Amino acid sequence: MTNIRKTHPLIKIINHSFIDLPAPSNISAWWNFGSLLGICLVIQIITGLFLAMHYTSDTMTAFSSVTHICRDVNYGWLIRYMHANGASMFFICLFLHVGRGLYYGSYTYFETWNIGVILLFAVMATAFMGYVLPWGQMSFWGATVITNLLSAIPYIGTTLVEWIWGGFSVDKATLTRFFAFHFILPFIITALVMVHLLFLHETGSNNPSGLISDSDKIPFHPYYTIKDILGVLLLILILMMLVLFSPDLLGDPDNYTPANPLNTPPHIKPEWYFLFAYAILRSIPNKLGGVLALVLSILILMLFPILHMSKQRSMMFRPLSQCVFWILVADLFTLTWIGGQPVEYPFIIIGQLASILYFMIILLILPAISLFENTLLKW
């Protein structure tokens, strides 16, 4: 009798994806983040579902319902903070996952890569709408500022913003629809994740050397299942340390004040994981230009397969490209820092220089360095 694992139509799919999957023998811990993102998504959906059981999406009661969850619901505070800090862990894993893809040239699997970029957009949209739901000061003003950016679109901008708001300002209609979208998007993300994996398993995983590894494959289970479990334990350890010791470390104190349309907070800023894009947005004095730069700062990832000029796939054997890559990482840290600072000298000029450098590295410096490294190969 053949094993049910290999014959059953449904179990067979799981078997080919997680058990008998041929994987390169040399993939490092940087390849753990895919599974960690899967765990993050599961944590977010489960905690989010339990929060939705007690949350009310009405402007009058939203803030109170979150307070009620934290004070009166059994372990409500735990669920709420796991969900809030789970989002931070999600983005940490996302950024490391994308960074791994850039460093090791994984973007040459362009279907997998482009779906990954769409996933990044979807997760960012979900996180933004989730931040609006507690209806604190930063929720309200964040929603107002970010949705208002769409008014920069010529001709249809103002109509579009009022259509999204469901009125002439961010109000009850906006909150209700954001809750609806915030609830449905994670399931759309789950479907996209399956497509992401489908395309990945068409080609097989990349590896640190960037070379074809067909001649040296090992089964995913038990080797990488054990390795992934270690990553999951570390992820849960860090998440629970955040949740139980400093749950508000990454939040904004302004969000503990109920939303008030008559009182603007002194510094409107999004959650930390959007600060780099927010800094790029603010560094351009023109509204439409800023919005375009904001969208392009993420959309530019789709250009990496086209901009890849090197004869080698990975950066493992390209020290000059490695230097430029780490300068890009430092630049993103700088942008994140600037995004959280007030709009005044010297932060404005630092933000503008960091934004220019970000686009320069991706569009000019990295391809140029790659071409230069190709000439060095001929020596």
Curated annotation (Swiss-Prot):
GO cellular component: mitochondrial inner membrane; respiratory chain complex III
Binding site for heme b b566: 97, 196
Membrane topology term: Multi-pass membrane protein
Function: Component of the ubiquinol-cytochrome c reductase complex (complex III or cytochrome b-c1 complex) that is part of the mitochondrial respiratory chain. The b-c1 complex mediates electron transfer from ubiquinol to cytochrome c. Contributes to the generation of a proton gradient across the mitochondrial membrane that is then used for ATP synthesis.
Binding site for a ubiquinone: 201
Keywords tagged on the record: Electron transport, Heme, Iron, Membrane, Metal-binding, Mitochondrion, Mitochondrion inner membrane, Respiratory chain, Transmembrane, Transmembrane helix, Transport, Ubiquinone
Transmembrane segments: 33-53, 77-98, 113-133, 178-198, 226-246, 288-308, 320-340, 347-367
Name the record gives this protein: Cytochrome b
Family note: Belongs to the cytochrome b family.
Residues involved in heme b b562 binding: 83, 182
Name of the gene: MT-CYB
Cofactor: heme b
Other comments on record: Heme 1 (or BL or b562) is low-potential and absorbs at about 562 nm, and heme 2 (or BH or b566) is high-potential and absorbs at about 566 nm.
GO biological process, one term: mitochondrial electron transport, ubiquinol to cytochrome c
Cofactor note: Binds 2 heme b groups non-covalently.
Oligomeric and partner information: The cytochrome bc1 complex contains 11 subunits: 3 respiratory subunits (MT-CYB, CYC1 and UQCRFS1), 2 core proteins (UQCRC1 and UQCRC2) and 6 low-molecular weight proteins (UQCRH/QCR6, UQCRB/QCR7, UQCRQ/QCR8, UQCR10/QCR9, UQCR11/QCR10 and a cleavage product of UQCRFS1). This cytochrome bc1 complex then forms a dimer.
Alphabetized InterPro entries for the sequence: Cyt_b/b6_C (IPR005798), Cyt_b/b6_C_sf (IPR036150), Cyt_b/b6_N (IPR005797), Cytb/b6-like_sf (IPR027387), Cytochrome_b (IPR030689), Cytochrome_b_C_euk/bac (IPR048260), Cytochrome_b_N_euk/bac (IPR048259), Di-haem_cyt_TM (IPR016174)
Pfam families attached to this UniProt entry: Cytochrom_B_C, Cytochrome_B
Superkingdom of the source species: Eukaryota
Compartments reported by the entry: Mitochondrion inner membrane
Molecular function terms from GO: metal ion binding; ubiquinol-cytochrome-c reductase activity
